[in-house]
Amino acid sequence: MNISYEGIGALVVTFPGGTCRTGQVCKIGIAGGADKCSSGDKFCGVMLAGEGGVSTVQVEGFVQVGYSGTKPSLGYTVLAADGTGKVAANANGREYLVVEVDTEEMTAIIKL
């Protein structure tokens, strides 16, 4: 049996362009755009698309993210941006619900 969390509780917003790329975790930059996170930054969501000077960012719901470093634990885990568009365990981050981890692809499904 396959389980999918895709689209559950998704809230997607549009921001002016920024420095973030599709699939990366992002933050709201100084100019109000979807900007790439530095290592240790708290992230607001995941960029789904960017074109025409605007960025579409998922800020709530279940979403797949890449991770680096240690595999995130299932359940509530403190995560922050790793500076490459992925997430990593980091005590200075925020707590997210991790429901699935793929160690081969180094991805996790989290609830924003």
Residue ranges of predicted features:
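Surface-exposed, low-hydrophobicity beta-strand/loop segments enriched in small/polar/acidic residues
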Residues: 1-112
